[in-house]
């Protein structure tokens, strides 16, 4: 490849026959390599004969996982201890205690009884001092024309 001429374009290379020579050269190299590599396959191929009986299928055993003390537990026993059932009063007491710890109040009713002072209250005006609701607008167009009132 040191003495090779490089054509200006592929059209010049095709006209001069340079592309054909390079292709033939590469084809010869690949044919030589393929002849060398036609040795027998390195992995043996096992062909099973259907006339011979097949061996027994492999047995699968499911093993039990031992518990922490090394004894295998039976499938019917549960490894978790049963929790005592709490009454409604006990659950409400625990809830109130947790709510007091987190929110600072024991019951949700206390929150609802307090008026919310963050929002301003709406001051109602007497009926006669209110503005009339029937506002008539007469829009103008972008160039100062009559807008929607203009007839075409």
UniProtKB/Swiss-Prot annotation:
<feature type="modified residue" description="Phosphoserine">
    <location>
        <position position="37"/>
    </location>
</feature>
<protein>
    <recommendedName>
        <fullName>SUZ RNA-binding domain-containing</fullName>
    </recommendedName>
</protein>
<feature type="domain" description="SUZ">
    <location>
        <begin position="42"/>
        <end position="107"/>
    </location>
</feature>
<feature type="modified residue" description="Phosphoserine">
    <location>
        <position position="39"/>
    </location>
</feature>
<feature type="compositionally biased region" description="Basic and acidic residues">
    <location>
        <begin position="113"/>
        <end position="130"/>
    </location>
</feature>
<feature type="modified residue" description="Phosphoserine">
    <location>
        <position position="107"/>
    </location>
</feature>
<dbReference type="InterPro" id="IPR039228">
    <property type="entry name" value="SZRD1"/>
</dbReference>
<feature type="domain" description="SUZ-C">
    <location>
        <begin position="111"/>
        <end position="152"/>
    </location>
</feature>
<dbReference type="InterPro" id="IPR024771">
    <property type="entry name" value="SUZ"/>
</dbReference>
<feature type="modified residue" description="Phosphoserine">
    <location>
        <position position="51"/>
    </location>
</feature>
<feature type="compositionally biased region" description="Polar residues">
    <location>
        <begin position="66"/>
        <end position="81"/>
    </location>
</feature>
<comment type="similarity">
    <text>Belongs to the SZRD1 family.</text>
</comment>
<dbReference type="Pfam" id="PF12901">
    <property type="entry name" value="SUZ-C"/>
</dbReference>
<keyword id="KW-0007">Acetylation</keyword>
<dbReference type="InterPro" id="IPR024642">
    <property type="entry name" value="SUZ-C"/>
</dbReference>
<feature type="compositionally biased region" description="Basic and acidic residues">
    <location>
        <begin position="89"/>
        <end position="100"/>
    </location>
</feature>
<feature type="modified residue" description="N-acetylmethionine">
    <location>
        <position position="1"/>
    </location>
</feature>
<dbReference type="Pfam" id="PF12752">
    <property type="entry name" value="SUZ"/>
</dbReference>
<keyword id="KW-0597">Phosphoprotein</keyword>
<feature type="modified residue" description="Phosphoserine">
    <location>
        <position position="105"/>
    </location>
</feature>
<feature type="region of interest" description="Disordered">
    <location>
        <begin position="30"/>
        <end position="152"/>
    </location>
</feature>
């Amino acid at each position: 490849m040191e003495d090779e001429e490089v054509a200006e374009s592929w059209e010049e290379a095709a006209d001069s026959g340079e592309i054909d020579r390079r292709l033939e050269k590469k084809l010869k190299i690949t044919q030589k390599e393929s002849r060398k590599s036609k040795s027998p396959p390195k992995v043996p191929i096992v062909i099973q004969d259907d006339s011979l009986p097949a061996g027994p299928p492999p047995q699968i055993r499911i093993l039990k996982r031992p518990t922490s003390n090394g004894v295998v537990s039976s499938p019917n026993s549960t490894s978790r201890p049963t929790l005592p059932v709490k009454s409604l009063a006990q659950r409400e007491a625990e809830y109130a205690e947790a709510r007091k710890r987190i929110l600072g109040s024991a019951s949700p009713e206390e929150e609802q009884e307090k008026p919310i002072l963050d929002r301003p209250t709406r001051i109602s005006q007497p009926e006669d001092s209110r503005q009339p609701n029937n506002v008539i607008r007469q829009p103008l167009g972008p160039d100062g024309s009559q807008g929607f009132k203009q007839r075409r």
